[in-house]
Regions:
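Positively charged, low-complexity/disordered segments
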Residues: 242-244
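Conserved donor-binding loop and adjoining core beta-sheet/short helix segment
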Residues: 33-119, 240
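Acyl-donor-binding surface of acyltransferase catalytic domains
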Residues: 85-187
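A conserved beta-strand-loop-helix scaffold within acyl/acetyltransferase catalytic domains
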Residues: 6-48, 54-64, 139-150, 159-161, ...
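Conserved aromatic-histidine-acidic binding/catalytic patches
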Residues: 80, 122, 191
């Protein structure tokens, strides 16, 4: 039997989320502290008393008492369990109505296609069936969008995992670019708040050059403070005394 609880503790929420394959920073309880211009709520879902799903919700108040609800990179659950998925979606609809939400936007990490280690890209065989079932439950899918503005979180990601990285497997041009940068005095520096001023200055220059709007220094400071032991700034620093 499935049940749910609104307002679970941050400890219980994080303990469950961190143990799941879909664990994501945006579903951590601390993300509500970063997005402090939204209200937030945590919902736990249970099967016979054992937690099987979680949703960290961001709630934006609108005029006339309405709201919108956003669950970034969540809910966290086993999407292959359609019975559980049905219960979670119905619960979120009920929760949305209680908050007078115009809509509840979910944003789970469901991989459609991936390429690992430079191999041929492979389609995930099960994801389409999950999407079909979500549609049957009344969920609207944004589709395989291509423009950045079409989604809140990036739909396409390029991840290189440390355990899989091999310099020799990089394309020849990439390896040459790295060697050239190193020889010219470009070094990778990883740090924290001591790099914040330099990093913020670079972001501002990027804004001016590209004609876009990025986050400001205070936002990066908030991330470093909120995730003190898990957040870092990576900068490429140039020193002119290296070999020409």
């Amino acid at each position: 039997m499935y049940t749910y609880k609104i307002g679970i503790s941050s400890e219980a929420h994080d303990q469950f989320v961190l143990a799941q394959p879909q664990a994501d920073l945006l579903q951590s309880s601390n993300w509500g502290k970063v997005k402090d211009n939204w209200e937030h709520e945590r919902i736990g879902f249970y099967e016979d008393g054992i937690q099987v799903a979680a949703a960290a919700c961001l709630i934006r108040k609108l005029p006339l008492g309405f709201t919108i609800i956003y669950i970034p990179r969540g809910p966290i659950m086993d999407y292959a369990n359609f019975e559980l998925l049905d219960f979670v979606v119905k619960t979120l609809k009920t929760f949305g109505k209680s908050k007078r939400a115009l809509f509840v936007k979910i944003d789970p990490s469901l991989v459609i296609k991936q390429t690992l280690g430079g191999k041929k890209s492979e389609e995930n065989e099960f994801t389409p069936s999950i999407i079909t079932f979500l549609k049957e439950l009344g969920v609207e899918w944004s589709g395989r969008t291509k423009e950045l503005e079409d989604t809140i979180q990036p739909r396409v990601q390029a991840n290189i995992y440390a355990k899989d990285f091999d310099f020799d497997s990089l394309p020849k041009k990439a390896k040459q670019s790295i060697r050239t940068a190193t020889n010219k005095g470009v070094n990778i520096t990883i740090g924290g708040t001591e790099l914040l001023d330099d990093f913020s200055t670079l972001m501002k220059k990027t804004e001016d050059r590209k004609g876009i709007i990025l986050r400001g220094k205070s936002y990066y400071q908030k991330l470093l403070n909120t995730y003190a032991s898990h957040s870092y700034i990576t900068c490429l620093l140039y020193t002119s005394d290296a070999a020409d």
